[in-house]
Amino acid sequence: TGMVPLISKATRNGVPVSEFLNEEKQNFVIEETKIGGATLTKLLGTSAWYAPGAAVSVLVQSVVCDQKKMIPCSLMLDGEYGQSDICLGVPAIIGKNGVEKIVDIPLTEAEKEKFTTAANAVREVNGDLKF
């Protein structure tokens, strides 16, 4: 998967997970996060029909009510996260003007490398699709 869970930003009750999970357990959490959606739909014996509708509802509410919520969105990047001319899922502030700002979260060197790898995988698929 091209998902890059940011374990360096993960906390529990305000405490960084790195303070109570060793590297092996952190890697386990990362891998489980990547497949969590598929695991849940398999356990429920259904498809992901609710989540997309709920996500659209949150987006519309943030625009209509100018809530300026930070919401993960697939957006065309122009230098953010070191990427340009590619749509990737990143956090953005959504308000009455739509995308008000792409939130450029500081990444560790390892996370930057994984993000670049994911971006290159998307570029490869886009190339296969002739985008």
Identify the role of each PLM range.
Residues 1-131:
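C-terminal substrate-binding/catalytic lobe of Rossmann-fold NAD(P)-dependent dehydrogenases
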